[in-house]
Regions:
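Short beta->alpha junction loops/turns
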Residues: 19, 89-90, 131, 145
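A general structural signal for well-ordered alpha-helical segments in protein cores
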Residues: 7, 26-27, 57, 67-70, ...
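Conserved AdoMet
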Residues: 32-107
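A short N-terminal interaction module
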Residues: 1-57
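A general secondary-structure junction signal
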Residues: 28, 77, 169-171
Length: 179
């Protein structure tokens, strides 16, 4: 089946279940399956998808049809100015949380070395975004979930900040006495 037909059928399928952005989500899923940017897919709209990839596409589409968030299906979410890997072990970074970055940056002078504490780090998107903006700073990021810490460590490494963040798998109440 060619890309244009896949997009047409996929978006129609998602629209039946009142998925908010059926066309975009279908394109994003096709992009994941083909490992191509959306623009490249649209420029090659008559390319065919092989049967194995078509099955993968259909499985992802069914997950989206069942209202699984597109970010969990894709395995990433953009936050602030960066791409963060995510999975079901962490919450999906929300656009309104970017306000926290804006406000925090007002209190972190660009030329000063400060220490940041990120409690409940999850994907690490907040601490990584802050350190990208304030390279002289360092941080400690804590989370009760070992799986979340692993996701955050992966994101720190992805953004080449693994040496600037001390990750601790601990409950906040225990951290007080730990520190």
């Amino acid at each position: 089946m060619i890309y244009s037909e896949i997009i047409k059928r996929g978006s129609k399928f998602l629209k039946k279940n009142k998925i908010k952005n059926p066309y975009l989500d279908t394109e994003l899923i096709l992009s994941k399956v083909t490992n191509k940017k959306r623009e490249e897919i649209l420029l090659n709209i008559n390319n065919k998808l092989n049967n194995i990839d078509l099955l993968k596409f259909q499985n992802y589409l069914i997950r989206r049809y069942r209202k699984e968030p597109i970010a969990y299906i894709l395995g990433y979410k953009y936050f602030w100015k960066h791409k963060f890997l995510i999975n079901k072990s962490v919450l999906i970074p929300r656009p309104d949380t970017e306000l926290l970055i804006d406000e925090t940056l007002k209190y972190l002078p660009i030329d000063k070395s400060k220490r940041i504490l990120d409690v409940g780090t999850g994907s690490g998107c907040i601490v990584v975004s802050l350190l990208k903006e304030r390279p002289k700073c360092t941080a400690t990021a804590i989370d009760i979930s070992k799986k979340a810490i692993n996701v955050a460590k992966t994101n720190a490494k992805l953004h080449q900040l693994e040496n600037k963040i001390n990750f601790i798998n601990i409950d906040i109440d225990k951290y007080k006495s730990y520190n």
